[in-house]
């Protein structure tokens, strides 16, 4: 079902009903772009840590707009052993509300827009008919503005507004506005004396003049009239004054208040759908869904927090249960029988043995999708086939039980190992971001960090490390990359061999991480200095500590290419006999648990968060024997 601004309100109850009835949901988003700076390959480096990947996406992807949101609800019919689906395709756009903030600024990426256009995407449905939305802070501010306007209109008679120059008006009226206000009062007196006229339309005026009119009339005519602001076709605002008795005045005030509340709800718009999904606490399915989740939280709840641990806490408060089908398909027992985990190819593979396509049917009044037509990159369709993929894989897990189970529900313990783990694209040794605990910390003692001239290509790096057999290269930027060797003991040899190189520099991954942490500490210490000290240092550059200057230039420069050129890193006999590097295990550290999301979340989400923690404390730990088939479905701690 296609939902735009014009039919959103009349179909909202259908959306709520579908969410309430569903066993689980599948979601998908389409964006105005992916990266505003680095290329996608640089944005997704193969040796990113989860924190680094989060920071990259937060910095380079959140200024784009999620402008199409697909939602497909799935409800299992036990009588006919089939799923009933309801698909929704929402077009979303941050339309400015009633001249009030926020006036959202966003960016577009030409390649993304061109791609969507080639897929038949209708951008008019976004920019002309998109459903508005507000995050929770924007909604709070807008409601406060309305309350303030009402208090100004209804409470102008307070003594604090009495002018020392007049005993007739409790408002201080500027000299240049007194004539204007006197003319308005005179017109109202004529209206009250007239037996024929019931209404008076004033000329369009400024917001400040309207405020003076409201305050003056509220004090001078506490009864007998009703004052309302309307708007012309040209978007000019004017005031209408009507003669009414007290009962009619109260009725109109109540009517006006109800209209304002309705306008506020309209401004909140699509965010109400996200709130309903979140408050349901049900399982939300996505495919490669990290970016979808980040945009959803950022756009419809609150800006993303500064660090990953806070993001994890916030996300699990909003969506208690998430499942990523790309991670699921990349994990045993699926990994060995699914070669391609892209959504389109995964959907095709799961129709073949040993899998069985699920039996599904669209609910009455909802259009059905034909997977043969492949309406890819329509968010509603992508959400639909994401749900189908989940059902097929979940049911396949049921075949390992004794006796086999044909239908595995969204509440089954078989799929719990996949909860709240989001697939990390193109990371070689950390397959997922763990929202409910510490992330994996793989040993990277076989990885080197290499800096080199910007003229170098991938072939130059392969030539440099040709003596070390198979290598993997992950570019960081134009002048640096990670190089993964096949054997950890080769790292020491490569570093020692390159000590006197002029055009490139090699360090171990541990050294690279250590220096980055040192730079962060220096930067943090610098920012914590007083403004006075910082200003004095700006005035006198010689005051900058020598150690800081030396550290910066030592870590951020290398000799330009010389006539010596590149050389092959062939190890000598002496270097080959050097002792191996230390291969100690990196211990896992517990992530800090914060309440950073408590304030921007609703009371319902706070309660859900509390119940989830209680459940963790009260639920007995379930131990599964290593010989049990269930161990096949554990998301591994190592990759």
From Swiss-Prot:
The keyword RNA-binding applies. The modification N6-acetyllysine is found at residues 220, 499. It is an enzyme of class 3 (hydrolase). Divalent metal cations. Mg(2+) is the most probable. InterPro entries: CAF1_poly(A)_ribonucleases, Nucleotide-bd_a/b_plait_sf, PARN_R3H, PolyA-riboNase_RNA-binding, R3H_dom, R3H_dom_sf, RBD_domain_sf, RNase_CAF1. It is found in: Nucleus; Cytoplasm; Nucleus, Nucleolus. The keyword Hydrolase applies. GO terms for biological process: box H/ACA sno(s)RNA 3'-end processing; miRNA catabolic process; nuclear-transcribed mRNA catabolic process, nonsense-mediated decay; nuclear-transcribed mRNA poly(A) tail shortening; poly(A)-dependent snoRNA 3'-end processing; priRNA 3'-end processing; siRNA 3'-end processing. GO terms for cellular component: cytoplasm; nucleolus. Keywords: Acetylation, Cytoplasm, Exonuclease, Hydrolase, Magnesium, Metal-binding, Nonsense-mediated mRNA decay, Nuclease, Nucleus, Phosphoprotein, RNA-binding. Phosphorylation by MAPKAPK2, preventing GADD45A mRNA degradation after genotoxic stress. A divalent metal cation binds at residues 28, 30, 292, 382. The record marks 326 as: Interaction with poly(A). PROSITE patterns: R3H. It catalyses: Exonucleolytic cleavage of poly(A) to 5'-AMP. Residues 178-245 form the R3H domain. The modification Phosphothreonine is found at residue 631. 3'-exoribonuclease that has a preference for poly(A) tails of mRNAs, thereby efficiently degrading poly(A) tails. Exonucleolytic degradation of the poly(A) tail is often the first step in the decay of eukaryotic mRNAs and is also used to silence certain maternal mRNAs translationally during oocyte maturation and early embryonic development. Interacts with both the 3'-end poly(A) tail and the 5'-end cap structure during degradation, the interaction with the cap structure being required for an efficient degradation of poly(A) tails. Belongs to the CAF1 family. PANTHER family: POLY A -SPECIFIC RIBONUCLEASE/TARGET OF EGR1, MEMBER 1 (PTHR15092), POLY(A)-SPECIFIC RIBONUCLEASE PARN (PTHR15092:SF44). This is Poly(A)-specific ribonuclease PARN. The lineage of its organism: Eukaryota, Metazoa, Chordata, Craniata, Vertebrata.
């Amino acid at each position: 079902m296609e939902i735009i601004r014009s039919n959103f309100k009349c179909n909202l109850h259908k959306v709520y009903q579908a969410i309430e009835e569903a066993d689980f949901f599948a979601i998908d988003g389409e964006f105005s772009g992916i990266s505003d700076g680095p290329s996608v390959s640089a944005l997704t480096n193969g040796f990113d840590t989860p924190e680094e990947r989060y920071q990259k996406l937060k910095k380079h992807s959140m200024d784009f707009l999620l402008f199409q949101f697909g939602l497909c609800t799935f409800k299992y019919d036990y009588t006919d052993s089939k799923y009933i689906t309801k698909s929704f395709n929402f077009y979303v756009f941050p339309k400015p509300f009633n001249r009030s903030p926020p006036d959202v600024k966003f960016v577009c990426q030409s390649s993304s827009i061109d791609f969507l256009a080639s897929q038949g995407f209708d951008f008019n449905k976004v920019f002309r008919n998109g459903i508005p939305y507000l995050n929770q802070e924007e909604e709070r501010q807008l409601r406060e503005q309305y309350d303030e306007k009402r208090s100004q209109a209804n409470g102008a008679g307070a003594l604090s507004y009495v002018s020392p120059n007049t005993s007739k008006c409790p408002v201080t009226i500027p000299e240049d506005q007194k004539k204007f206000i006197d003319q308005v009062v005179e017109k109202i007196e004529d209206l009250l004396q007239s037996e024929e006229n019931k209404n008076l339309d004033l000329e369009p005026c400024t917001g400040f003049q309207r405020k003076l009119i409201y305050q003056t009339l509220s004090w001078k005519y506490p009864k007998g009239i009703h004052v309302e602001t309307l708007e012309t076709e040209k978007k000019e605002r004017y005031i209408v004054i009507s003669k009414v008795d007290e009962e009619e005045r109260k009725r109109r005030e109540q009517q006006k208040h109800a209209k304002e509340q309705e306008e506020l709800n309209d401004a909140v718009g699509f965010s109400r759908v996200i709130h309903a999904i979140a408050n349901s606490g049900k399982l939300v399915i996505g495919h490669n869904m990290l970016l979808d989740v980040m945009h959803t939280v950022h756009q419809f709840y609150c800006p993303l927090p500064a660090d990953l641990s806070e993001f994890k806490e916030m996300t699990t408060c909003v969506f208690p249960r998430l499942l990523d089908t790309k991670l699921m398909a990349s994990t045993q027992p699926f990994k060995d029988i699914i070669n391609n985990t892209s959504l389109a190819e995964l959907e095709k593979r799961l129709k073949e043995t040993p899998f069985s396509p699920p039996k599904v049917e669209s609910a009455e009044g909802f259009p059905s999708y034909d997977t043969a037509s492949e309406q890819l990159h329509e968010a509603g369709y992508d959400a639909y086939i994401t749900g189908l993929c989940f059902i097929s894989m979940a049911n396949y897990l049921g075949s390992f039980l004794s006796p086999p189970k044909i239908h595995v529900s969204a509440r089954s313990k078989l799929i719990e190992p996949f909860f709240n783990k989001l697939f990390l694209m193109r990371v070689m040794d950390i397959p997922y971001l763990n929202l409910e605990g510490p992330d994996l910390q793989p040993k990277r003692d076989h990885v080197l960090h290499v800096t080199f001239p910007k003229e170098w290509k991938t072939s130059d790096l392969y030539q440099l490390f040709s003596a070390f057999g198979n290598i993997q290269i992950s570019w960081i930027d134009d002048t640096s990359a990670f190089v993964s060797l096949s054997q950890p003991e080769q790292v020491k040899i490569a570093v020692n061999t390159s000590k006197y190189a002029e055009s490139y520099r090699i360090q171990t991954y541990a050294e690279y991480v250590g220096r980055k942490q040192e730079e962060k500490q220096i930067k943090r210490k610098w920012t914590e200095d007083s403004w006075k000290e910082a200003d004095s240092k700006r005035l006198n550059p010689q005051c900058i500590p020598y150690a800081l200057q030396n550290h910066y230039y030592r870590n951020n420069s290398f000799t330009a290419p010389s006539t010596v050129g590149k050389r092959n890193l062939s190890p000598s006999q002496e270097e080959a006999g050097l002792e191996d590097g230390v291969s100690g295990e990196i211990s896992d550290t517990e992530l800090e648990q914060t309440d950073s999301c408590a304030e921007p979340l609703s009371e319902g989400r706070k309660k859900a968060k509390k119940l989830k923690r209680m459940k963790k404390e009260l639920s007995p730990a379930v131990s599964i024997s290593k010989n049990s088939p269930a161990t096949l479905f554990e998301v591994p701690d190592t990759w």
